[in-house]
From Swiss-Prot:
Produces ATP from ADP in the presence of a proton gradient across the membrane. The alpha chain is a regulatory subunit. ATP binds at G169, D170, R171, Q172, T173, G174, K175, T176. Disulfide bonds: none annotated. It comes from Listeria monocytogenes serovar 1/2a (strain ATCC BAA-679 / EGD-e). It is an enzyme of class 7 (translocase). GO terms for cellular component: plasma membrane; proton-transporting ATP synthase complex. It is found in: Cell membrane. PROSITE patterns: ATPASE_ALPHA_BETA. GO terms for biological process: proton motive force-driven ATP synthesis. This is ATP synthase subunit alpha 2.
Length: 504
């Protein structure tokens, strides 16, 4: 076999032409300090704020402080295996979480990783956790109601789709119950719900998930959890992960409800990180940008205009108060960012008024324009009546010689308070809310004993379901009150069948 020099030279030339030298250039730094969930690294001069960084053991971190000599990093995972002198390299990416329909029904952590033991989440879509909120011209006015199923909220402080309504109160006043009941009521409302649990006990989150599963609400709910036992960076990031998942649905024309339970714990986690990163403390030791921490999160809730699909994110942020002090730093910040607040009071809660909503301090700045016409008609004077009753109640403690008109107002007020009470995890459809409020306003309850009011409501709902479902259907579909003569006749007919407990 003869070797041809031309062939060999052509093969060598071909291989030289096809050779490409690919140099991978990456910025690599060295860990100079590690502890308490944060690290400092030297040599990452080109790192960007919020950029993901990778440690030599595969754990990720996020650049927070860009200083002259080093970079302050919050660590997104276990930090016990990281040592001083370890390598840390730039990734050129910012943090993203998985998004899409595959997340519905799952429980995930702040990084979007499943923690429910049901296997991996099959989705390829991701979104950055930090995004610019929709601008003024991309939005439209709130004009659709979000029915919570809670009479005291839908009647007194209505919430619209795209609104941000703060729920504020001391611990153990039923804040989480309000959120869970609102999620349960979205079953047939074409709404996707995201429940973000920040700094909760793992047993509490488990109970919430089981409640949602028991009522079939996990079919349209995503749970994002950063438990109290997890590092502060994960508590800080959890709300942003939740709203990023929500934005995917909103920009596809869907309606989303996001519950942040609660932002006080997120602010405390951010304070911890900021102090560890040696940022100067301000009021109550919070850093100077703690207002921006919450404003950039809550501004991402919006009702988009029709050209963008008309989707919405409704935000229900929670803030925990200490001994009812709503003038503390974080409560006043979030009150000024949101479109209203629902104040839950421990005195009312322990006196048996549940949900313990203080109608005087609670307000909805935009939801009234989204209330259905029937509800607006029957609930118009309810807030004033309740305020007058509270005033008379405190006044009546000093004297017993009250005139007939005052006594009548007090009796009506007692029945109003009783009507607004509601059992746990039993949200009420809006047509049935309208029915009982109509009966209250039109004096059908004036001669019903106070302790029988809730039984009257329950029996009336059952009676209307069987005898006049068309009236309920009319309220549901037209969103207006049916013919008053028919409604009055039906209510009188039911009233004649109702037997007070004394006469049984």
């Amino acid at each position: 076999m003869s070797i041809k020099a031309e062939e060999i030279s052509s093969i060598i030339k071909q291989q030289i032409e096809n050779y490409h030298s690919e140099l991978k250039v990456s910025d690599v730094g060295t860990v100079t300090y590690i502890g308490d969930g944060i690290a400092r690294a030297h040599g990452l001069d080109n790192a960007m704020a919020g950029e993901l960084l990778e440690f030599s053991n595969g754990v990720m971190g996020m650049a927070q402080n860009l200083e002259t000599n080093d970079v302050g990093i919050i660590i997104l995972g276990p930090y016990t295996e990281i040592r001083e002198g370890d390598e840390v390299r730039r990734t050129g990416k910012i943090m993203e979480v998985p998004v899409g329909e595959a997340l519905i029904g799952r429980v995930v952590n702040s990084l979007g990783q499943p923690v429910d033991g049901l296997g991996p989440i099959e989705t390829t879509g991701t979104r950055p956790i930090e995004a610019v909120a929709p601008g003024v011209m991309q939005r439209q006015s709130v004009n659709e109601p979000l029915q919570t199923g809670i009479k005291a909220i839908d009647a007194l402080v209505p919430i619209g789709r795209g609104q941000r309504e703060l729920i504020i109160g001391d611990r153990q006043t039923g804040k989480t119950s309000v959120a869970i009941d609102t999620i349960l009521n979205q079953a047939d409302q074409d709404m996707i719900c995201i429940y973000v649990a920040i700094g909760q006990k793992e047993s509490t989150v488990r109970n919430a998930v089981e409640t949602l599963r028991h009522h079939g609400a996990l079919d349209y709910t995503i749970v994002v959890t950063a438990a109290a036992s997890q590092p502060a960076p994960l508590l800080y990031l959890a709300p942003y992960a939740g709203v990023a998942m929500a934005e995917e649905f909103m920009y596809n024309g869907k309606h989303v409800l996001v519950v942040y339970d609660d932002l006080s714990k997120q602010a405390a986690a951010y304070r911890e990180l900021s102090l560890l990163l040696r940022r100067p403390p301000g009021r109550e030791a919070y850093p100077g940008d703690v207002f921006y921490l919450h404003s950039r999160l809550l501004e991402r809730a919006a009702k988009l205009n029709d050209s963008l699909g008309g989707g919405s994110i409704t935000a229900l942020p929670f803030v925990e108060t200490q001994a009812g002090d709503i003038s503390a730093y974080i409560p006043t910040n979030v009150i000024s960012i949101t479109d209203g607040q629902i104040f839950l009071q421990s005195d009312l809660f322990f006196s048996g008024v549940r949900p313990a909503i203080n109608a005087g301090l609670s307000v909805s700045r935009v939801g009234g324009s989204a209330q259905i016409k029937a509800m607006k008609t029957v609930a118009g004077t309810l807030r004033l009546d309740l305020a007058a009753y509270r005033e008379l109640e405190s006044f009546s403690q000093f004297g017993s010689d009250l005139d007939a008109a005052t006594r009548a107002k007090l009796e009506r007020g007692k029945r109003t308070v009783e009507v607004l009470k509601q059992d746990l995890h039993k949200p009420l459809k809006v047509e049935k809310q309208v029915l009982i409020l109509y009966a209250l306003v039109h004096k059908y309850l004036d001669d019903v004993p106070v302790h029988d009011v809730l039984r009257f409501e329950s029996e009336m709902n059952t009676w209307f379901d069987h005898n006049h479902p068309e009236l309920l259907e009319e309220i549901r579909t037209t969103k207006k009150l049916p013919d008053e003569a028919k409604l009055e006749a039906a209510l009188k007919e039911f009233k004649n069948t109702f037997v007070p407990s004394e006469e049984k």
